[in-house]
A protein has these predicted regions:
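N-terminal alpha-helical interaction blocks
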Residues: 1-115
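Generic structural "secondary-structure junction" signal
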Residues: 13-18, 23, 117, 132-134, ...
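Residues in well-ordered beta-strands of folded domains
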Residues: 42-44, 74, 90-93, 147, ...
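Short secondary-structure junctions
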Residues: 57-61, 145-147, 228-229
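Unchanged
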Residues: 64-114, 203-278
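A gly/proline- and charged-residue-enriched helix-loop-helix capping module
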Residues: 97-141
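Cys/His-rich short segments
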Residues: 125-175
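N-terminal strand-loop-strand
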Residues: 155-197, 202, 224-225, 229, ...
Length: 278
């Protein structure tokens, strides 16, 4: 896996120490709120407050309005950002945006590729963990409201004492090529017309990543593929996925045509004549 390939995965970039030991301090948020160096990343309805079109706004604690959730993201390791290395950063989810205009906010899909390594990592981490909080407010055992602890990285059931930890859903995305070096593309049933992508799908329980590649391609296109090769991974917090990239090739001697499944994939194309640069 080359660094040049990883540099093309904008959400895999980071310049942050997640400081897992700091999460264990019982008075962590009291300490952070008393520290004038602490900076806050505001999140509202899945979007972040921007300082410029290509940078996040990080505010001092006393500038933060009321919030519904907060998570300690860690300390910056960037030496090129306005805030010095070692700056502690907390993500805060707002109930409302107050006086801030809609144009002051942007979501990760809009700005992810434009952000610095530090800011891309911050926003990706913040969205992933805040999405987890949204979907785990109640205990799966007792139905009681859970309590956020350890810097926002654990939720505890106050009745049973059981702890719930963040989870990530692995999904594969695969570039399939044939003997003529054409690449397989598909159009999702939920997309607008003439929009295509590589085939992708979630990994099922008890399944390896490589097996998921072969199963998903066959289910969605009817093709049999072999030799899945791992390329790299990218977090995809929409809401909680890790996209794991592979290449694979159509099995030698396979003569069937690619056929969309009609449910998830409505169309397929192999119009990229030369896949070597993809």
């Amino acid at each position: 896996m080359s660094q040049s390939f990883l540099s093309r995965l904008p959400l895999s970039r980071f310049e942050l120490d997640r400081d897992h030991l700091g999460r264990e301090r019982p008075a962590l948020f009291d300490e952070l709120w008393a520290n004038p160096a602490t900076r806050i990343l505001l999140i509202f309805q899945g979007s972040a407050l921007l300082a410029t079109p290509d940078s996040l706004a990080l505010l001092p604690v006393d500038a933060v309005p009321h919030f519904s959730e907060r998570v300690y993201l860690g300390t910056s390791t960037s030496t090129t950002s306005p805030e010095p290395a070692g700056t502690p950063i907390v993500a805060v989810e707002l109930d409302d945006a107050g006086h801030l205009a809609e144009s002051d906010w942007a979501n990760l899909r809009q700005v992810g590729s434009r952000l610095s390594d530090r800011d891309a990592g911050l926003l990706t981490e913040a969205l992933g963990i805040l999405n987890w909080h949204t979907s785990h407010r109640f205990s799966p055992r007792t139905g009681e409201p859970t309590v956020s602890e350890k810097g926002g990285w654990v939720r505890r059931d106050p009745v049973s004492g059981g702890e719930v930890f963040p989870r990530t859903d692995p999904a594969i995305i695969v570039g399939v090529t044939d003997a003529d070096d054409r690449i397989l593309l598909g159009s999702n049933a939920l997309w607008e017309s003439n929009r295509y992508s590589l085939l992708a799908g979630f990994v099922e329980p008890g399944e390896s990543l490589e097996s998921a590649v072969m199963r998903e391609v066959h289910e969605e296109s009817g093709l049999r593929v072999v030799d899945p090769v791992y390329l790299g991974s990218q977090p995809w917090p929409f809401p909680a996925s890790l996209m794991v990239g592979f290449t694979a090739r159509v099995e030698d001697g396979f003569t069937g045509a690619a056929t969309p499944d009609g449910a998830e994939i409505l169309d397929r194309g192999a119009q990229v004549a030369d896949a070597s640069g993809v």
